[in-house]
Amino acid sequence: MADQVYFEDVEVGAEIPSLVKEPDSLQLVQWAAGSGDFYQIHYDPAFAKRNGLEGPIVHGALKHAFLGELLHQWVAPGGRIKRVACSYRGMDLPNRRLTHKGKITKKYQEGARNIVELEIWAEDANGKTTTPGSAVVTLPSRA
């Protein structure tokens, strides 16, 4: 985890540090067990291919969790994640790099709260955005 980020130090348009993940088949099975999502397209190559896929695909909700981890690593320990939303626009295969990124789109104060809005997304190994989203976080003040 990096040093604490403060509200006064962030600027609209700035990107936050990225998070790289390369989920493998074991992580997909572990996610299935934890989430209860045992749909075979996430772990059975033959089933995935019979359903028109190249092979098993990463759970969308796992990519959502990675985006949450990206935000947590950026705001912690003193900031808080208030909202995370994303949509699943592309299928990602296991054992391939996923890079999770964020860009500050707005910052403002609401009462005593220091609010930062971000565009967030996951990119596949080719740089294609497969999971676009948005987030709202609060950051501590230096004051």
Question: Where do the model's predicted regions map?
Answer:
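Hot-dog-fold acyl-thioester-processing enzymes
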Residues: 2-81
